[in-house]
């Protein structure tokens, strides 16, 4: 029989920069998990992922051990990097803050494909395009 799961946490932590300060420390400390052990393991696994925030799902077991799964960076972070902007538009219908080509859309969709709820690359591109439009980014063919 496997270990008994007592909790699951979802956090977004900068790649390679996990430390015991909030939000990591308090979230893990409440569940009596070894914070430094998690930080070292997370930083080692994400050191080559650039400066993105990385979504992580931490499964905590009854014996206070843990496992974690890292996901790909959020679509909005990938879009901001591709469009070379720091934040989306405050009014996406009126103010356009950047442009993306369909090739860039496809690259983002390929990167994020395993995390998206899409059956093929075309559906993934539509999801990414919708996120880009809601940020005030124009899509060019």
Curated annotation (Swiss-Prot):
What cellular-component terms does GO give this entry? Answer: cytosolic large ribosomal subunit
Q: How is it modified after translation?
A: One or more lysine residues are methylated.
Can you tell which superkingdom this protein's organism belongs to?
Answer: Bacteria
Q: Give one GO molecular function term.
A: structural constituent of ribosome
Give yes or no: UniProt keyword Lipid biosynthesis.
Answer: no
Instruction: Give TM regions.
Output: none
Intrachain S-S bonds: none
An example Gene Ontology biological process: translation
PROSITE patterns listed in its UniProt record: RIBOSOMAL_L11
Question: Which UniProt keywords are given for this protein, alphabetically ordered?
Answer: Methylation, Ribonucleoprotein, Ribosomal protein, RNA-binding, rRNA-binding
General function of this protein? Forms part of the ribosomal stalk which helps the ribosome interact with GTP-bound translation factors.
Query: What PANTHER family does this protein's entry cite?
Result: 60S RIBOSOMAL PROTEIN L12 (PTHR11661), LARGE RIBOSOMAL SUBUNIT PROTEIN UL11M (PTHR11661:SF1)
Outline the subunit composition.
Answer: Part of the ribosomal stalk of the 50S ribosomal subunit. Interacts with L10 and the large rRNA to form the base of the stalk. L10 forms an elongated spine to which L12 dimers bind in a sequential fashion forming a multimeric L10(L12)X complex.
In which family does this protein belong, per the annotation? Answer: Belongs to the universal ribosomal protein uL11 family.
State the protein's name.
Large ribosomal subunit protein uL11
Question: Quick one: which gene encodes this?
Answer: rplK
